[in-house]
């Protein structure tokens, strides 16, 4: 399993989610969306094409497992860090 966390430096929820992932011993790669704007906008555009109501905010996680990947986005898929962690565990 591979977890990628799309984040922003000053995002309090992003910081809290990083801490929670560490507490759970889940390794992850961080991508700062302001450094990788083109990549982030491409992902957001792709998700909007799949679901026009799919607005994605940070933090967003990409969980890849057994050849499939799913995006878990704040405001769309979870409202709290605890909910985000529950969603991640569904794909373990």
What is the predicted role of each segment?
Residues 9, 34-35, 76:
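Short beta->alpha linker loops
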Residues 26, 59-61, 71:
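Generic alpha-helical hydrophobic packing signal
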Residues 33-56, 86-92:
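Thioredoxin-like thiol-disulfide oxidoreductase module
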Residues 12, 38, 79:
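Short alpha-helical
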Residues 1-30:
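Local sequence-structure signature of Cys/Sec-based thiol-disulfide redox active-site neighborhoods
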Residues 63-92:
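Non-catalytic, surface beta->alpha helical segment in thiol-disulfide oxidoreductase systems
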Residues 47-67, 80:
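Long, continuous compositionally biased terminal/linker segments
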């Amino acid at each position: 399993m591979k977890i990628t966390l799309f984040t922003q430096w000053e995002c309090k929820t992003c910081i809290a989610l990083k801490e929670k992932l560490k507490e759970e011993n889940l390794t992850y790669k961080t991508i700062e969306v302001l450094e990788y704007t083109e990549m982030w906008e491409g992902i957001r555009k792709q998700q909007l094409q799949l679901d026009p109501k799919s607005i994605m905010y940070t933090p967003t996680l990409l969980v890849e497992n057994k050849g499939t990947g799913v995006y878990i986005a704040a405001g769309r898929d979870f409202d709290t860090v605890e909910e985000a962690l529950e969603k991640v565990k569904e794909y373990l």
